[in-house]
Amino acid sequence: MSQTFELYEDSSGEWRWRLRAGGDIVADSGEGYASKSGARDAVETVKGGAYDAPVEEQ
């Protein structure tokens, strides 16, 4: 299944990201960023830091 991060500007002028897998949105930023680079930095954090994150039941 192909996965793609998308960066986009919302209607308020803030930058956001979403992760698509097989055409479905499986994750999103949940918040807007003032700059495109801020949203891109958040994507890099998710890509680099979550691969071995534990799953905790709440």
Task: Describe the function of each predicted region.
Residues 25-35:
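A short, exposed loop/beta-hairpin motif centered on an aromatic-Gly-Thr core
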